Amino acid sequence: TDANGCSASTNTTIVNGINPQATVSAGGATTFCQGGTVVLNAAGGTSFLWNNGATTQNISVTTPGNYSVMVTNAAGCSSMSNSTLVNVLQAPNAVATAYGPTTFCQGGSVTIATSGGTSYAWSNGSTAQSILPTTSGTYSVIITGANGCTATSNAINVTVNPIPTA
């Protein structure tokens, strides 16, 4: 009440915001071979800010690291998710090398070999570390590393010329 005997009242609504429960789930394995990807999905709010700068609810990850997201709900309250570790495994170095000329006459051959890896799948069906092609064709190898990752080598073209008749 003031000096004139007047009084006033004000209604105030207090909103007690509750922090959202920020969670991250992976849409696949978080350890994968080079060239792979995993989608990380955020939940618990209406807006999202990932530690890599993305502002979408879901992110597609191809690089290793720890990923977390700040989630904000409709009341403007925020919370940070736990970190999700993404590991990217190195693919083997897949190089096929010809040890000799790749163009030769019928009856000849050339050794094509690779190194590294633990298993090999050549385009001609061989599973050895090296092959000795005697027919024309394009040869490459899929190498599997100790970590299970694969890589395809360069292609080597072999040309076998017929022996001329007299």
Model-derived features: positions:
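Proline- and Ser/Thr-rich low-complexity, intrinsically disordered segments
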Residues: 1-166
